[in-house]
Amino acid sequence: MKYTQGKYQIAGKRALAKDIFSIDIKCPEITEIACPGQFVHILPPGFTLRRPISICDIDKKSGTLRIVFITKGDGTKEIAKLNEGELIDMLAPLGHGFTIDNSFKKIILVGGGIGTPPMLPLAKIYGERTTVISGFRSAEAVILQRDFKAAGAETILCTDDGSTGRKCLVTEPLAELLKEGNADAIYACGPAPMLKRISEIAENSGVFCEVSLEERMGCGIGACLVCACKTRKDGEEHFAHVCKNGPVFNSKE
């Protein structure tokens, strides 16, 4: 796993929704090797423990990396206070990303809440072959829909309260699309119960599926056991590091 650590200039910052921020980081040496599904480990000012944040976009031409995150604790709140022109301490790119297969003709991307940003690089790669299903609590939490449409993807929006889009779980339109039998692959990121159900649906439909796990992390490089999780391969249980072996896993694992 090749990665680098340094302080990089913030090229842009904006609020996308309540407590959700987007930051563009100038880091050409990282964008050259980063791939969809990987993450960055950011050190908030005044803290000693880094925070893992998924990569939302990789612009090799401009040499900028985009992250989108929600402010849940003190660490992410400090990151959100950083402004354009300031430096951000980052270890990146980390983890095992998504499998890209250009033979796929129809791709379904499923994002739940803050699990939606990692889907954007895939939408940009697969373009018009992509249908993006996004799920949020309410209309005020919706993000990145214009970005997905700009990438050429078809979008299906779901909310828990029905304040915009469909009032349903993301698994409902997913099952409908698979019933039509026109999907070659599913990529998903979001809460564990959502990923578990998507994995079951994919296996029952015989469709290739990869999921990106959201997990607490310590070192980010596989040296500690904070993010260890059970996986299954060839009928046997194994332990894997989400930060190193993941965060992307085949759904059958």
Regions found by a protein language model. Give the residues of each.
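Ferredoxin-reductase
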Residues: 2-84
